């Protein structure tokens, strides 16, 4: 895997559940691509996962990917919890069905194609790309609402 790609992603929700949005930035060398979208009935965690999914779906070939997010749910899910969920048949340590299984399964499928490193950053703490992704997600929420007026 020669291509090294940086991904920054964030999800947001106005109400939880409620209207949600995601934002992602893909960086390959000096080139950048921004992605964003919204959903009318979702949760913050679903948008965090969707941001990473959409970013990985945008990659056309296997890459070494560093994904930076402010979501501990996403980072811990992928680095600590996922293998146990799969081993236990998609139930968590409390013997309850894993929430957002559809998105976790898609992430698992997509990350299998790449060499992925997960990085957590504190949200709303001045990290430039995280702030940009948050703004993309919030703009997607606003656009979604404006389209439905």
UniProtKB/Swiss-Prot annotation:
Cofactor: Mg(2+)
Gene Ontology CC terms: cytoplasm
Signal peptide per UniProt: none
Amino acids binding Mg(2+) 2: 10, 134
Nuclease as UniProt keyword: yes
Function statement: Endonuclease that specifically degrades the RNA of RNA-DNA hybrids.
Protein's recorded name: Ribonuclease H
Upper taxonomic lineage: Bacteria, Pseudomonadati, Thermodesulfobacteriota, Desulfuromonadia, Geobacterales
């Amino acid at each position: 895997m020669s291509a090294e790609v940086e991904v920054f992603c964030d999800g947001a929700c106005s109400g939880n559940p409620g209207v949600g949005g995601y934002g992602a930035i893909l960086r390959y060398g000096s080139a950048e691509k921004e992605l964003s979208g919204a959903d009318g009935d979702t949760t913050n965690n679903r948008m965090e996962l969707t941001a990473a999914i959409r970013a990985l779906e945008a990659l056309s070939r296997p890459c070494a990917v560093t994904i930076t997010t402010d979501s501990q749910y996403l980072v811990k899910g992928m680095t600590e919890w996922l293998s146990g969920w799969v081993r236990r048949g998609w139930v968590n340590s409390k013997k309850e069905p894993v929430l957002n299984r559809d998105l976790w399964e898609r992430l698992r499928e997509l990350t299998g194609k790449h060499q992925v490193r997960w990085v957590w950053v504190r949200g709303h703490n001045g990290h430039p790309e995280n702030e940009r992704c948050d703004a993309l997600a919030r703009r997607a929420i606003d656009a979604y609402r404006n389209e439905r007026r």
